Amino acid sequence: MDDLPLNVGLPIIGVMLVLIVAILCYLAYHWHDTFKLVRMFLSYRWLIRCCELYGEYERRFADLSSLGLGAVRRESDRRYRFSERPDEILVRWEEVSSQCSYASSRITDRRAGSSSSSSVHVANQRNSVPPPDMAVTAPLTDVDLLKPVTGSATQFTTVAMVHYHQEYT
């Protein structure tokens, strides 16, 4: 059997190399998540945990719109944006112990000369969205948002930081 001609074999090799490089770049960029997936795969309950974690992730993403700041668009695993505002939510997913206590949300006034901060529950932010010169750091403390998936051995805390930007003229 003759070898493939050069004009057929070269594009195939090129496509394979591009795919391999793309996979390696993805793994390098998401090394932390990849490491977690490898550890989960090596555990004996990897399939059950994978389903639980996916369900938890999707449910929490759906609940982000309950902040009352408009529709939310997912840009990556950790970055979300509101469709009608220039605000952004950064979400940190991390395992927490059962003894963990959840702090209430904080609104911090970032105006010049002001250092005041007040505690606000996320549920109350629906009707009291701060003006554009305020910066919000809001750990989601709603009971539904922090409730783990039924039967899940892992809990997650979702931390949402909403940044308000205003150009001064």
Curated annotation (Swiss-Prot):
A GO term from the CC aspect: host cell Golgi membrane
What keywords is this UniProt entry annotated with?
Answer: Host Golgi apparatus, Host membrane, Host-virus interaction, Membrane, Transmembrane, Transmembrane helix
Disulfide connectivity for this sequence is: none
Which compartments does it reside in?
Answer: Host Golgi apparatus membrane
Q: Where is this region: Disordered?
A: 109-133
Transmembrane stretches in the record are: 8-28
User: Which is an annotated GO molecular function term of this record?
Assistant: molecular adaptor activity
Tell me a GO biological process for this protein: positive regulation of receptor signaling pathway via JAK-STAT
Subunit composition and interactions: Interacts with host TNFR1. Interacts with host MRP1. Interacts with host UAF1/WDR48. Interacts with host STING1.
What is the purpose of this protein? Plays an important role in the establishment of latent viral infection. Modulates the expression of several host cell surface receptors such as TNFR1, CD36 or the MRP1 transporter during productive infection. For instance, associates with host MRP1 and induces its lysosomal degradation. Plays an inhibitory role in the host cGAS/STING/TBK1 pathway and upstream of IRF3 phosphorylation and NF-kappa-B leading to inhibition of interferon beta production during both lytic and latent infections.
- What is the protein name stated in its UniProt record? Protein UL138
> Which species does this protein come from?
Human cytomegalovirus (strain Merlin) (HHV-5)
